[in-house]
Amino acid sequence: MLRALSRLGAGTPCRPRAPLVLPARGRKTRHDPLAKSKIERVNMPPAVDPAEFFVLMERYQHYRQTVRALRMEFVSEVQRKVHEARAGVLAERKALKDAAEHRELMAWNQAENRRLHELRIARLRQEEREQEQRQALEQARKAEEVQAWAQRKEREVLQLQEEVKNFITRENLEARVEAALDSRKNYNWAITREGLVVRPQRRDS
């Protein structure tokens, strides 16, 4: 209590002096000191329900959109009536100006369409030439692969023909047998891990 009174006494000289007028009965002026019971009072705002606040905000937004749409509709209607009221020379001049601007825009649009059409034709021709070049390169590569495959098969055939000469057939079977019997090569030997040749020893009968 003493702290409140001292604070009230310290704050009084800093405030402007109250005007010398009779206040209304039952109501204080802005310059009157606060009551003792309200000096340390803290005004707390009332609690707000989040769901109710969300609903109110949605309704307020809908209200603003509706009012804005009505306002725009009213403004457009007023402008249309003013424009209809000014029918005459100004409206005719504006119509002529709009027609001339429309013709200029149509001419520019046609020129732009022709330019884009030419660019498209040039691009398609370029793509066609590139496609032909790719096809020619692909055909050349396939031809080279076919030629390489044919040469490889030809070499295999020649090698097989050379190997066929050493094959044993019915015609040269007897000659090959005689040649093998007349050969002095001895295949009856072995090699040790140390690289020595071991031949079978003949047993005396």
Swiss-Prot record:
Pfam families: MRP-S26 (PF14943). InterPro entries: Ribosomal_mS26. Residues 1-27 form a transit peptide. This is Small ribosomal subunit protein mS26. Component of the mitochondrial small ribosomal subunit (mt-SSU). Mature mammalian 55S mitochondrial ribosomes consist of a small (28S) and a large (39S) subunit. The 28S small subunit contains a 12S ribosomal RNA (12S mt-rRNA) and 30 different proteins. The 39S large subunit contains a 16S rRNA (16S mt-rRNA), a copy of mitochondrial valine transfer RNA (mt-tRNA(Val)), which plays an integral structural role, and 52 different proteins. It is found in: Mitochondrion. The gene is MRPS26. It comes from Homo sapiens. GO terms for cellular component: mitochondrial inner membrane; mitochondrial small ribosomal subunit; mitochondrion; nucleoplasm. Belongs to the mitochondrion-specific ribosomal protein mS26 family. Keywords: Mitochondrion, Ribonucleoprotein, Ribosomal protein, Transit peptide. One of its GO terms (biological process) is mitochondrial translation. GO terms for molecular function: RNA binding.
